[in-house]
Curated annotation (Swiss-Prot):
<feature type="binding site">
    <location>
        <position position="338"/>
    </location>
    <ligand>
        <name>UDP-N-acetyl-alpha-D-glucosamine</name>
    </ligand>
</feature>
<dbReference type="InterPro" id="IPR052463">
    <property type="entry name" value="O-linked_mannose_GnT"/>
</dbReference>
<keyword id="KW-0735">Signal-anchor</keyword>
<dbReference type="GO" id="GO:0008375">
    <property type="term" value="F:acetylglucosaminyltransferase activity"/>
</dbReference>
<keyword id="KW-1015">Disulfide bond</keyword>
<dbReference type="Pfam" id="PF15711">
    <property type="entry name" value="ILEI"/>
</dbReference>
<keyword id="KW-0812">Transmembrane</keyword>
<keyword id="KW-0808">Transferase</keyword>
<dbReference type="GO" id="GO:0030246">
    <property type="term" value="F:carbohydrate binding"/>
</dbReference>
<feature type="modified residue" description="Phosphoserine">
    <location>
        <position position="7"/>
    </location>
</feature>
<feature type="transmembrane region" description="Helical; Signal-anchor for type II membrane protein">
    <location>
        <begin position="38"/>
        <end position="58"/>
    </location>
</feature>
<dbReference type="InterPro" id="IPR039477">
    <property type="entry name" value="ILEI/PANDER_dom"/>
</dbReference>
<feature type="binding site">
    <location>
        <position position="371"/>
    </location>
    <ligand>
        <name>UDP-N-acetyl-alpha-D-glucosamine</name>
    </ligand>
</feature>
<keyword id="KW-0464">Manganese</keyword>
<comment type="pathway">
    <text>Protein modification; protein glycosylation.</text>
</comment>
<feature type="binding site">
    <location>
        <begin position="506"/>
        <end position="507"/>
    </location>
    <ligand>
        <name>UDP-N-acetyl-alpha-D-glucosamine</name>
    </ligand>
</feature>
<dbReference type="GO" id="GO:0030145">
    <property type="term" value="F:manganese ion binding"/>
</dbReference>
């Protein structure tokens, strides 16, 4: 090994140097940046290609739509039809003077668009049946009114005629039918449609579809109609497209004197339609009233709560009658609106009244119940010194002597703990069963429909246990329950001081109103002096009832009480009849008697300890339930109480009217 020498061809061995960490990081970072730039460049190129392709596709599609739009058939499906619609056309760069209007009518859906904006779309099941009407301002194109009239049901055509007659000339009218709109479309309504220039409207048949656009008092701007081929089917959907030329602002406005009242009127009339002469340019109806003051007005400082929803035309009618009543105090009136609806608040502002809106709670009848609770609580918070509150609803006419009636009777609530309320409504007070506007009764039921509530009753008893939102109860039925009423009674007049005119509501329709509300008697005589008011106190009333029964002539019980001859053809007499009533809740005979007397018969109302009081042929007619009533002692021994048996229930009988 001593003679070993390294080879000159091999490099000497040395330790390998490690690369710097900085150079390694810089190398990797350079590679990542290059990759990112590459990806970004690719993405930009991809987007450019996509944009070019889409532009070409849009141009080709518009060309195809333009060629096909003239051939659009009314029977096409709604979605297909909308897919082929042109976008709203624009004329130049200045203000537009033409509206693009599209109207769709079919069995299950209606639709209206103005310049591409949907102003009506209704496809809810079992709702919105009938003729939908929209009113546009002829100068601006904004929606001034939206209504639906269920002209399948009775009297809705009358409401439509009234509304259309209230619309000012020149306004743009749009009509469209959902489901069925002809069944109760009578000649008067058809004649009105004919006067508007419609050709198809007056000939509208069973389950036809129809769309119409025109000016009131001006030309028809478009109309389409499809007849139903058979009773079991509907007309094809129709889709109407038309241009509506706009008028000048000068033509659409009135030039009233610049007063505070007219400024309110101008704000109202520029926004909404369907209120008739209140917006007349030449002779507008007053919006301020000056009824005579009421001498010794006991209700001058009693707050009035008007319970309202989204029925502005009802509210308008109701407030006009309320503000015209003798003794009214406008500063004591508050309108409570269930929901943030604009038009009802416009009506309130028109009359210069206080309006309060709140968020709806719950659904259906529970929503109404919560609305009442919130409104009553707010009323006593607004007027903490008030002992009472008057409760009204938006669909009531108020008699001219409404406050006079309350002023003469409200002391009874303070002096008689056996009383529950004072109501302006007589459930049994029909045109043929009510006669004396000066006469008062005590009844065990709570009629509502214009009534006075004692604050102590509400705060101490009703408010703490008011039905909660999850309970779908009617507030008035709950108040009538024995647990709330606790044997107390209400004071009512023989002739009502309120009239229920509303035919659209949660528990109301045309059939129901026709049968039970339309023919109620309503006092129109001012200044009625109530008779023997203090005799309505608990003990005094018993004396009065016994006096009446002692003087009454007993009718011939062998006759049929449902026949007109049951009562003699006299006037001014008092008669009594005795009917079978085995116990306090046995109302079999009374219910059948109420049916043949054509008065309220759905449940028992208007009674006092088994006694009913009404008028027949201008005679005071008393009915006593035997033996349940304590007044049975007045029955002569020879008289057998009348018994009317309930008819057998029919199995499979017709139910309530449903969507056609």
């Amino acid at each position: 090994m001593d003679d070993w020498k390294p080879s000159p061809l091999i490099k000497p061995f040395g330790a390998r140097k490690k690369r710097s960490w900085y150079l390694t990081w810089k190398y990797k970072l350079t590679n990542q940046r290059a990759l990112r730039r590459f990806c970004q460049t690719g993405a930009v190129l991809f987007l450019l290609v996509t944009v070019i392709v889409n532009i070409k596709l849009i141009l080709d599609t518009r060309r195809a739509i333009s060629e096909a739009s003239e051939d659009l058939e009314p029977e096409q499906d709604y979605d297909e039809a909308l897919g082929r619609l042109e976008p709203p056309r624009r004329i130049g760069s200045g203000p537009r003077r033409v509206l693009d209007v599209e109207v769709y009518s079919s069995r299950s859906k209606v639709y209206v668009a103005v310049d591409g904006t949907t102003v009506l779309e209704d496809e809810a099941q079992e709702q919105g049946r009938g003729i939908h009407v929209i009113v546009l301002n002829q100068a601006t194109g904004h929606v001034m009114a939206k209504r639906v009239f269920d002209t399948y049901s009775p009297h809705e055509d009358e409401a439509m005629v009234l509304f259309l007659n209230m619309v000012a000339p020149g306004r743009v009218l749009i009509c469209t039918v959902k489901d069925e709109g002809s069944f109760h479309l009578k000649d008067t309504a058809k004649a009105l449609l004919r006067s508007l220039g419609s050709q198809a409207g007056p000939a509208l048949g069973w389950r036809d579809t129809w769309a119409f656009v025109g000016r009131k008092g001006g030309p028809v701007l478009g109309e389409k109609h499809s007849k139903s081929p058979a009773l079991s089917s509907w007309g094809d959907p129709v889709l109407l497209k038309t241009d509506v030329p706009l008028s000048s602002a000068e033509e659409a406005e009135c030039h009233w004197a610049d007063t505070e009242l007219n400024r309110r009127r101008r704000r109202f009339c520029s926004k909404v339609e369907g209120y008739g002469s209140v917006c007349s340019c030449k002779d507008p109806t007053p919006i301020e009233f000056s009824p005579d003051p009421l001498p010794d007005n006991k209700v001058l400082n009693v707050p009035v709560a008007v319970i309202a929803g989204n029925r502005p035309n009802y509210l308008y009618r109701m407030l006009r009658s309320l503000l015209s009543a003798q003794g009214v105090s406008p500063q004591m009136i508050t309108v409570f609106i269930d929901g943030y609806y604009e038009e009802p608040m416009d009506v309130v502002a028109l009359f210069g009244l206080r309006g309060i809106q709140h968020t709806p709670i719950s659904i259906k009848n529970a929503r109404v119940s919560q609305h009442y609770k919130a409104s009553l609580t707010a009323t006593f918070n607004l007027f903490p010194e008030a002992k009472f509150a008057v409760v009204l609803e938006e669909d009531l006419d108020i008699a001219v002597d409404f406050f006079s009636f309350l002023s003469q009777s409200i002391h009874l609530l303070e002096e008689d703990d056996s009383l529950y309320c004072i109501s302006a409504w007589n459930d049994q007070g029909y045109e043929h069963t009510a006669e004396d506007p000066a006469l008062l009764y005590r009844v065990e039921t709570m009629p509502g429909l214009g009534w006075v509530l004692r604050k102590s009753l509400y705060k101490e008893e009703l408010e703490p246990k008011w039905p909660t939102p999850e309970k779908l109860w009617d507030w008035d039925m709950w108040m009538r329950m024995p647990e709330q009423r606790r044997g107390r009674e209400c004071i009512i007049p023989d002739v009502s001081r309120s009239y229920h005119f509303g035919i659209v509501g949660l528990n109301m329709n045309g059939y129901f109103h026709e049968a039970y509300f339309k023919k109620h008697k309503f006092n129109t005589v001012p200044g009625v002096q109530l008779r023997n008011v203090d005799s309505l106190k608990k003990d005094a009333y018993e004396v009065e009832v016994h006096r009446l029964l002692s003087e009454a002539e007993v009718l011939d019980h062998s006759k049929n009480p449902c026949e007109d001859s049951f009562l003699p053809d006299t006037e001014g007499h008092t008669y009594v009849a005795f009917i079978r009533m085995e116990k306090d809740d046995d109302f079999t005979t009374w219910t059948q008697l109420a049916k043949c007397l054509r008065i309220w018969d759905l449940d028992v109302r208007g009674n006092h300890r088994g006694l009913w009081r009404l008028f027949r042929k201008k005679n005071h007619f008393l009915v006593v339930g035997v033996p349940a009533s304590p007044y049975s002692m007045k029955k002569p021994p020879s008289i057998t109480p009348i018994f009317l048996e309930s008819p057998p229930k029919e199995e499979g009988g017709p139910g309530a009217a449903e969507q056609t």
